[in-house]
Amino acid sequence: MHGLLLAGLLALPLNVLAHPTESHSSGISRRAIDITSYRLPQISKYTKSDSLTGQDGQSFTASSADADTSSGDYVSTATNWLKKTLPNASYRLVNDHYIGDSGIGHVHFRQTAHGIDIDNTDFNVNIGRDGKVFSFGNSFYDGEIPKANPMVKRDFSDPVDALHGAIQTLNIPVTAKPENVKAKPVEGKESFKFEGTSGALSDPKAQLVYLQKDGGLVLSWKVETDVGDNWLLSYVDANDKGKVHSVVDYVSAAAYEVYPWGINDPTEGKRSTIHVPWFKTQSVDWHIDGKNWYPTTRGNNAIAQENPTGQREYENNYRPKSPLFIFKYPYSEAMSPPSSYRDASITQLFYTTNVFHDVLYILGFNEKAGNFQTNNWNKGGLGGDYAILNSQDGSGVNNANFATPPDGEPGRMRMYNWNASTPERDGCFEAGIVIHEYTHGVSNRLTGGPANSRCLAALESGGMGEGWSDFFATAIRLKNGDTRATDYTMGEWASNRPNGIRKYRYSTNLTTNPHMYVDADGLTSVHAIGTIWASMLYEMLWNLIDKHGKGDVSKVKPTLKNGVPTDGRHLAMKIVLDGMALQPCLPNFVQARDAIIDADKNLTGGSNKCEIWKAFAKRGLGVGAVYNPSKRTGSNELPAGC
């Protein structure tokens, strides 16, 4: 799950914000089950573009890095590269490959054994504009494959037993009485949908998979349950329903009289009426999905409504209607209760989310890359996955979260009210919270490919997920007069905390924010780790702004020349997005740094290499930095030439 928790606002197991002093406030955490102890292991490797080194000591020189392109397309090139790198591996091509706006082809593979997926093994190949392998990531299992094919003797438990095991072990609020539950086969090998349950937002599912764990493979049932605050993949031992090996959570704890884009919250400016704010090349119209024209806060990219009871249903929930598409409603900080300004809240949430969708589209998060749209207009990717936006959601307080299933399934944002002030405040009016949450959807779709939403499930990967979300929220709120001496908080207005919800402000001053890479040692909160990562990205942001300028931040639409943003602010965002698509599944800081440097190399020929390296090295992620989950090695070293 993804969200804001305070200091941790970003500390829930959802992609949520996180609160520094409060315990987890929703979902599984409410039931005293710590699913963070079930995280997937961090096993990925990333081979960057300027040092292609294969497995088993095999070195690829610049000339030998030319993959076989005789078959004519980037997917074949990637497939041949995998065959060359791991000639004995069994695998399948994941059907989510695409060529990004930066010209890089992204191809993803899943390892198999006896025709069964090894679910946490991934191989991603990035093909450059020249048709050659640019970089690749690998988490394939290199141990001995079990000799016995479990499908021959069907030596595994019934999927219904696995469902019961997940429910009982993790205390999932789903009722599945043995006499009522039936496992109905669906498309896919040993894949089932459970009928006769209650408590989940959709029918639970199960698929037989292997899981790479502790140096071996364990046959498991991957049980999927969406209960709102948690959308879980629980890997239950196929022969012992009481043993859960790992857990992934998809939830990562907007016409329009609104606070305009760039105004973070009511302390920074006034509401105004924005006319036709969408970018016509990115959104035909925010209220059209190709079949219908909705005179309400619904359209191709998002559907926004109130949800005061915190229920799972949303389509019939209240949302403002305007046959003339004039969404102007009263709001002031003094109004109370929140229900008295629900129309303004829903409209603000719909506006902020749609603008961010359009900005991200220009920067490369489009249909092929797995963005959130009902209709993909025949441009690739899977449609049917607008973002569900719940304003004033009654399932929690003092937080927010975003659930990110794979491409083709709608994402879901839950925005809560905050009660640390009188009257209480609505998180929909703090743009940074909305942007933070939506960015969880972006980072989960880009990392590991649109079809794989579990690639930020390891501790350090999940921490970077929180950091990317804070980074975008902060970069977007910059003002024309800001300099590298400007510091920013996160969640300050909603939480009513002058210093916000993070341990330190985001600052380039090491006295104000002393975070270093090695500070991640011993941390178990993704939100605390994320603050370190976002601090590094904030350094990079200002290095690029100092070199390229930040442009006129009052202009919403990014300006690109030959696919490259002309200002340093949007250039930083673009490089970060491209890096997400390059990096391996379950990356660590070092691998994500290398992917960002590779992204700039592909986008600009590496013209910003030193600015990027200086940002990371300043906070201990220089050339000599080494990842070790218990004792990281910091480095301030710069590469030659910088």
Curated annotation (Swiss-Prot):
Per the entry, which co-factors are needed?
Answer: Zn(2+)
Say if the entry is tagged with keyword Transferase: no
What is the superkingdom listed in this entry's lineage?
Eukaryota
As recorded in UniProt, its EC number(s) are 3.4.24.-
Q: Does the keyword Glycoprotein apply?
A: yes
Predominant location: secreted
What GO terms are given for molecular function? metalloendopeptidase activity; zinc ion binding
Indicate the residues removed as propeptide on maturation: 19-253
Disordered, as annotated region: 49-72
Q: What is this protein called?
A: Extracellular metalloproteinase 4
Q: Species name for this entry?
A: Arthroderma gypseum (strain ATCC MYA-4604 / CBS 118893)
